[in-house]
């Protein structure tokens, strides 16, 4: 899982796909953080992505660095504990101008039943389950 987090941080931006009814929705994201042995992302409760994940937690992310890409699929489960939100914000100080652990808006989700697949045109697939 650390390899997945490292890749996502190096990529800087990845794309998160969710479903809104039968319509896929994709948007750029930039947070990836390991807390208590789980890979977390962060968003705001006022955003459509939050509502989509609450209705259907199945999601997939995709990131690319040069000729290698990573896809992570699984369920994103909200962790409503303050310490989980604060850990994310501590790892991403730039978010603290927009979010706080106690603002009622900050939300963090962790991957459950996840499969990460590293791909490239030159190497065999590498699969990590967590």
Predicted regions and their residues:
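A short mixed-secondary-structure module that forms the rim of ligand-binding clefts
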Residues: 32-66
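A short, Trp-centered hydrophobic/proline-enriched beta-strand micro-motif
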Residues: 6-20, 59-61
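Short, surface-exposed beta-edge/turn micro-motifs
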Residues: 11-13, 37-39, 56-59, 104-106, ...
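General beta-strand recognition
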Residues: 15, 39-40, 71, 117
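Charged, gly/pro-rich active-site loop segments
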Residues: 71-130
């Amino acid at each position: 899982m650390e390899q997945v987090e490292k890749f996502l941080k190096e990529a800087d931006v990845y794309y998160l796909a969710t479903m809104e009814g039968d319509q896929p929705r994709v948007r750029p994201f930039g947070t990836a953080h390991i807390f208590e042995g789980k890979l977390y992302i962060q968003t705001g409760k006022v955003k459509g992505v939050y509502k989509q994940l609450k209705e259907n937690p199945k999601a997939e992310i995709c990131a690319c660095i040069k000729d290698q890409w990573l896809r992570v699929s699984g369920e994103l489960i909200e962790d409503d504990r303050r310490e989980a939100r604060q850990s994310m914000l501590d790892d991403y100080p730039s978010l603290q101008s927009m979010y706080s652990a106690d603002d009622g808006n900050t939300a963090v989700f962790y991957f459950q039943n996840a499969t990460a697949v590293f791909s490239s045109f030159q190497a065999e697939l590498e699969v990590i389950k967590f």
